Each structure stands twice: as structure tokens, then as C-alpha cells.
Amino acid sequence: MPRLLLLLLIAVCETVQAQNSSAGSDVSKQGVKEVQVPFASIRPSATIKIGGTADWVLVTDDAIWVASTKPYAVLRIDPATNKIVATVKVSGEACSGLAFGFGSIWVPICGEKPELVRIDGAKNTVSSTLPIAPAAPEGGIATSEDSVWMVTDKNGTLNRIDPSTNGVRQRISIPPGSYNPVFSNGIVWITGVESSVLTAVDADSGKVLESVAVGLKPRFLAAGGGSIWTLNQGDGTVSRVNERNRKVTATIRVGIPGAGGDIGYGGESVWPTVFGVPLTRIDASTNKVIRQWVGEGGDSLRCGFGSIWITDYKKGLLSRIALQQILKQ
């Protein structure tokens, strides 16, 4: 090979390698370095063994609920004692969130026989099994004042379920590839991971009000501070949407792209979690990342009873972290 051509090829190769290296080390894939500390520096007030895995945290007025595998179950924790007080076995893996409403815990199940399990919140037993399947894993479920809401296919069919009959009372078409709903102030909000939008549906009429463009591939979402917050798996950002005018008011660089994760609201802060970066705090008053904890753990969380309840999915653990403690770090 002629020497000049060889040198040119080497130069091109080095340039491509440098570009790939730069892309791979981009801060957007490493979190926000300047505010990072080890997740192991946090001292939980309690850590509870849930099962083979632990996922989908739910806070109710008097309990914390979390799903497990090995066994397939939904466990109830008493926040006064941090003890498991009930283990409700279900037919398969709880794969698309947990919701509370109408005295019941609603549990979408994936696997060989996808269905929707209804748990009596007073008796801690399965009261009904509905032949209504979630659209996909990493989806969600929500309750409003009179209905249960769940997407049941990849085409964007939002089912409105009547809790008095356990039947579907309305089917609403939303953008395909939408899976995760949350209810807030009369509106059901659903993220569209395939279309990168957040869709607002009137919870009274079922009318689609608007689809708002947010960050790339939004999936998990939370309501708080007059806003809806979406965790965008495609670019690792968090989008803030004003509930009143349905406008994006902030796009926050968090640097946590990729599958899985969760997001919650509490202590006037937004709390995303993903593997590798188990916890991030965003100050809702400034839309700034204040602190980011890196290391093992994370994947699902909720705030309640003065605490963050966060799972270590892979180890099957649920930890309780006092908000008063974590807000000082």
C-alpha cells in the first residue's frame, strides 16, 4: 500500500475513533458530573428484602406497596414499622405499574396470561381478575375519580375501566406507542415513547385535548408542583409541562438515557432513578439538578410518609430514605 494512502487511512481511522470516543464519553450519557456523589453515602432508615426483584412502588394513605418476582407477588409494608404485613400472590409478573383507587390495588400482569389483577386493600386478597391485558412491559396504570386507565395495545388504545363493573366503559385513541398514564387535576396524561409526546385526555369526557412535544422517548412521568414531569429515555432529559396551559416550561439535562427507570415528586423536588444513577434531585423551583447519586441500585421510587421509597431492582430490596436527610445533602 502506498505510504501516503496508508497515512491518510490512519488519520481517518483516528478521527472516527476520536468521534466515537467523544460520543461515548458525552456528559449526556454520564449524568451531571459536577454534582455527583456515591449512592452508598446515603444511609437509609430501613432496607427491606422484597423478593428476587423489587419494582413498582405505590404509596397509599396507610401503606407502601411494591411488586416482586420469586415469588410473583405484591407486598404491603407498614410505614409505621417498616415491616411487611401482607404478601399477596399474583398470577405473573407485575409489569406495568401499580395504582390505588376504589379501595383496591390495580396490578397489570404480563407473561403467558396477561391480565389485570384487583387486590382488596382492606383484606389484602385478590378480589377480581380482569381479562384486560396491559399493552407492554414498562407501561403504567392510573386511577381518576371514577375510572381506572390503562393502555392495552401498541396502537394507542386507552381503556377506561369502570370499577363498579370491572368492565371497559370507554376506549380512546391516543398516539401509537403510548403506554404510561398519570392522573392529575382532572386530566389523564400519557407519555408516547414512540412519538415523543405527552397527551392530555379529559378524565370526564375522555376527549383528547392535546399532544405536547417533549424530549426524546418519554416513558415514566410524575405530577407535582403544578407540572407534569417526563423522564425521557431517548436523550436522558426531564421535560416539565405546565398543567394549566400544557406548555413545556423546561427541558432539564440529567444525563440518564436508556431503558427502565422511574420518576417521582416530593419535597418540592423531582427524583428520577435509573440503573447506574439510582437517584437524582431536581429542584422544582429552579429546574436545576442539585445532586446526583451514582452506583448500584435504583429503578423504581415514590415519595410518601416523609421519605423516598426506592427499589434496588436487581437485589430485590426496598429502601426508605428520609426526605429531611436527603434534602440536606
Which residues are covered by each model-predicted region?
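Predominantly soluble domains enriched in secretory-pathway, periplasmic, or organellar proteins
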Residues: C13-Q329
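Sec-dependent N-terminal signal peptides
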Residues: L4-V12
